Amino acid sequence: MLFRSHVVIKGPTKIGAGNRIYQFSTIGDDTPDVKYKGEPTRLIIGDNNVIREGVTIHRGTVQDNSETIIGSNNLLMAYAHVGHDCVIGDNVIMVNNASVSGHVYVGDWAILSGYALVHQYVHIGPHCFIGPAAFVYHDVPAFITAFGSPAEPRTINREGLKRRGYSAEQISLANQAYKLLYRRGLQLDEAIKAITKLGDDPAILQFLNSIEKSTRGIIR
């Protein structure tokens, strides 16, 4: 465990083993959400995270699950912000000044580039890549790269999937699923039916699951 100078830790906050938190970060302070009235809420941080200079992470609110959760092995670069009630998975990278608003979910291995902004309640699927200064207003299915303001889908994160051990066949299936969803002019229900016909490979199931769990609608 490493805490550099001028780190502020409020609470209740639970921090796991092997974390490194750099100077001027504020961890577990009250949320500025106007609904928050001082109720007991908490922040949970897993193991082996690197939290760089000036990062802010707020606790949850009773209007949600009263918890903000950060998984393990994440890298939050300088001045990144994690709002109240967020759930950040494992192995996530938030580049300098990336910011996620309240109630956001970020899946494992996702990357948020510098100055990316994520609207409240948005879900970012696993292995997504969000481009620099993108504004994400709707949910992003697994494996997708998204750029722009508002963020629009570009392709699948091939390089990221290779690094994570997905086979060439699985990456091809993910690309086929992406094209059915975004490049064939199909309605969403039609695209889901067509993707289902690609089989039950875990990559396809993961892609479908991230679509079906969407509550804000997916980027289109």
Please tell me what each predicted stretch does.
Residues 1-152:
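Structural signal for interior beta-strand "rungs" in well-ordered beta-sheet cores
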Residues 2, 18, 24, 35, ...:
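Terminal amphipathic alpha-helical/low-complexity segments used for targeting or macromolecular assembly
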